């Protein structure tokens, strides 16, 4: 089978699927993407140039859509080059989030297209307005509604959609759901598995050495910000550290993946400042973002893993924490409840 994948950050959500297809040694796999250093043997990467950013004259509510249509054009141009070289895929699989798939049915009409549908945005009842501490201004609502422009374009294509959880499917309008299949994202259980040996010896994480008698509490997010409950976790530190054997590692950058940054500082610094100058942070480690092996070792050694999120897309780290056997404390939100059953696995 000739598989064509499309994702601006190769391999994106398709890592395990692509590896599985490569291991079958029976398929031709091409991947259109922005240039990056990621590599999977047996996959032919075809790069496209990142489109220039939207002009300042573009209305602020639709700049994201403007960028998406530029990506759609760039990917379609790349696809036409492949077609001129005689390439014809049997199926196209990609992520709709950045608009890259929107013009591909024009290049290869009749070729099945399976698009990853991640989230349909709402101005109420989901992530927006969930946290009373950080209320959205009504002026944000036009921008939030406009974020669905790519979703709505994608739903008009002669194509089918996939989404990884029942909750994510529920964010889409009822009329759209019959065209979207829930395909759960797996975890590589050969890699993400318990490692009891790590509890019997000291484990080094950066400059830290965690001993067998230490109780390790872990938290992981791409960035330490309210969407992923960083404020709740940081404010809980004084309570956690009342036990002298507890050590806490909070993995995540100081950037912003969702929402906006606080003015003149980072969310981490802002919330840590709330604890006061007298707070002893010697048993709290903020390593920033870490490599995958360090992250996996943390999960395997963790005594308690905390996963907090607004009603938004559940992170891969939640799945992987469960796979490694972590005792998970999760936020009581619908995306988490799909993975964590109270009293059974968290």
Which ranges hold each PLM region?
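Conserved donor-binding/catalytic core segment of Leloir-type glycosyltransferases
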Residues: 203-228, 234-238, 248-249
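Nucleotide-activated donor-binding/catalytic signature segment of Leloir-type glycosyltransferases, i.e.
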Residues: 256, 262-293
